[in-house]
Amino acid sequence: MNLYFLEADKPLTKTYAKKNGELIKSPYPMTWEFTSHQEQSSDLSSMLSLLNKHAALGHCLLKGVIARPLVRESRAGSTNSNDATDWLCLDLDGLPEHMETKTPSGQTLTTPLTLDLFLNEMGLQDVSYIVQWSASYGISNSRIRAHVFIQLDKPYAAPLIKQWLIQKNHDVDLLRNTMELTKTGNSIRWALDISACQNDKLIYIAPPVLKNIKDPMGKQPRIALVKGKYDILALNGGINTTEKNKQLTHTRINDLRDTAGLIKRKFNYKVVGGTEVLTKPAESVI
């Protein structure tokens, strides 16, 4: 696995502070110039060491491959959206705090959603993974906020992985039931981030700066390897086509619009400059 870490002129992390009982949050710094660091990882164990190394330095991880080394410069145009990758990132930031489970007698129970329960719902309970708990995890609530890294059996094109993520959002009841409309009412807020596969995606791995706040992780490592029965994941079993996922998404949007008392929408697209765009979108407020 080729891994690319990016360094900026300041640590790429969030800051949380308590002042007079009020929680003050400082977002990730806005920065445009980066220096890249290329690393080679043969398995998740070596990837774990590299993640810990660069997290301690305040670097972030780039999902894709950089075409050329960066030295204190913009990363614009440095990645190819169609490049293949042999590792998967699950960005968990939109999951519910609880889930419903059934007892053998058929009774419905409300259970706190743990990472193990989520991976079981995804069918990934037997696969080894690295979990990196996000800077915001445990600050305001116990909701899962993490990145999960899984080694793949071979390189897959990033657009194909995106279709796999979209399909999972539709097929896994936990994710499907968590879907919401965006403010415009014309698209979906995905429970499992479908952009985490994009080759230009920055994955923030550095621990937060905490001032007058106890670290919610305690002595638990923020980045850890969890061994499973299988060390790699094959994305087999059939991945939906783009058209199939588009139909599922349109149906789900209209179902949610109906629940919200909105009229159904008809979706039409055209290709502009090689990019498919929605024609005649509804009016929205920005």
Name these PLM-found stretches:
Residues 3-8, 25, 30-56, 72, ...:
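Catalytic "initiation/cleavage/transfer" segments centered on a nucleophilic residue
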Residues 1-146, 150-168, 262-270, 274-282, ...:
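Signature for HUH/AEP ssDNA processing cores
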